[in-house]
UniProtKB/Swiss-Prot annotation:
One of its GO terms (molecular function) is mRNA binding. Keywords: Ribonucleoprotein, Ribosomal protein. One of its GO terms (biological process) is translation. Belongs to the bacterial ribosomal protein bL12 family. Signal peptide: none annotated. This is Large ribosomal subunit protein bL12. The keyword Ribosomal protein applies. Residues 95-120 are annotated as: Disordered. Forms part of the ribosomal stalk which helps the ribosome interact with GTP-bound translation factors. Is thus essential for accurate translation. GO terms for cellular component: cytosolic large ribosomal subunit. InterPro entries: Ribosomal_bL12, Ribosomal_bL12_C, Ribosomal_bL12_C/ClpS-like, Ribosomal_bL12_oligo, Ribosomal_bL12_oligo_N_sf. It comes from Oceanobacillus iheyensis (strain DSM 14371 / CIP 107618 / JCM 11309 / KCTC 3954 / HTE831). SUPFAM superfamilies: ClpS-like, Ribosomal protein L7/12, oligomerisation (N-terminal) domain. The keyword Ribonucleoprotein applies.
């Protein structure tokens, strides 16, 4: 039987006959007709997880608070008092809506100074 003959035979089937055919194929080959739809949904979820903007959040200043305050001033351009207040009131966002590269750079500087940082 050629592909064209199979397609012609399928075209002539009723909905009930097509349903039975699908069930028979699923049982014969151990597959489900719903699997491709589920796989497409999972792939769509993976695309949504791909973020383009990140927030860098200072979770803790750690033991060397002075170094962290200096790093925060350098990163944000804040004055000494504002940077100290931000560090004292952690967890606080340091940078919001930045690229992945910038977020990793900021995270590296803060962790180097002794801070605990989270990128969201």
């Amino acid at each position: 039987m050629t592909n064209e003959e199979m397609i012609s035979a399928i075209k002539e089937m009723s909905v009930l006959e097509l349903n039975d055919l699908v069930k028979a194929i699923e049982e014969e080959f151990g597959v489900t007709a719903a699997a491709p739809v589920a796989a497409a949904g999972a792939a769509g979820g993976a695309v949504e997880e791909e973020k383009t903007e990140f927030d860098v959040v200072l979770t803790s200043a750690g033991a060397s608070k002075i170094k962290v305050v200096k790093a925060v001033r350098e990163i944000t351009g804040l004055g000494l008092k504002d940077a100290k207040d931000l560090v004292d009131n952690a967890p606080k966002p340091i940078k919001e809506g930045v690229s992945k590269e910038e977020a990793e750079e900021v995270q590296g500087k803060l962790e180097e100074a002794g801070a605990s940082v989270e990128v969201k």
